[in-house]
Amino acid sequence: EPLRNLAVVKESIKVMLSSYGFHLSPTAITVSTLGLPKEMLSLSKELPEIQIALSLHAVNDELRSKMMPINTKYSIAQLIETLKVMETLRKGPVMISYLMFKGVNDHLEHAEALNTLFVERKVIFNLIPFNPTELVSSEYQVCSRDQIQNFKAIIENAGFRVTVRASFGGDIDAACGQLASISGK
């Protein structure tokens, strides 16, 4: 979680943006987070043009807490309240990352719930197909491309911008979410 080391992350971003660093555009930088409200607000205030991606992956606290234990500390409702404040500090929308698992969080009712949760919020949804790996056992399964497209259509029909992350490197266990050692650590 990069925001657990916020001071270093901020300084690194400033170097990447500077003329003595990489001279990147702020919109070329995305910081992904599990959702640490205080740190999200601090980052938004100090660097309002960079992209922030909130890893959500569920539409209710019960499921999100099972998938992401951090949710027991910061609920979905708290994160949405944080997003409301961030909108007053930031120049652009926050990305909501949503890793899709077959039969777990991919039901069309979940798409409708996302629409309800984020009504009137400035967000972009990034749907991420699950990439399994033989190195790490998982109870999760891959969603069909059709299911992801149907899910996407429901969110788009509510007026949100939605992307589906392209997956590369799956053939060598190097796609998003697949990086692990042979020991599974």
Protein language model annotation of sequence segments:
Residues E1-I154, A158:
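Conserved AdoMet/S-adenosylmethionine-binding subsite of the radical SAM
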Residues L127, V164-A166:
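A structural preference for short, hydrophobic beta-strand core positions in alpha/beta folds
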Residues N157, S167-K185:
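Radical SAM enzyme core and accessory elements
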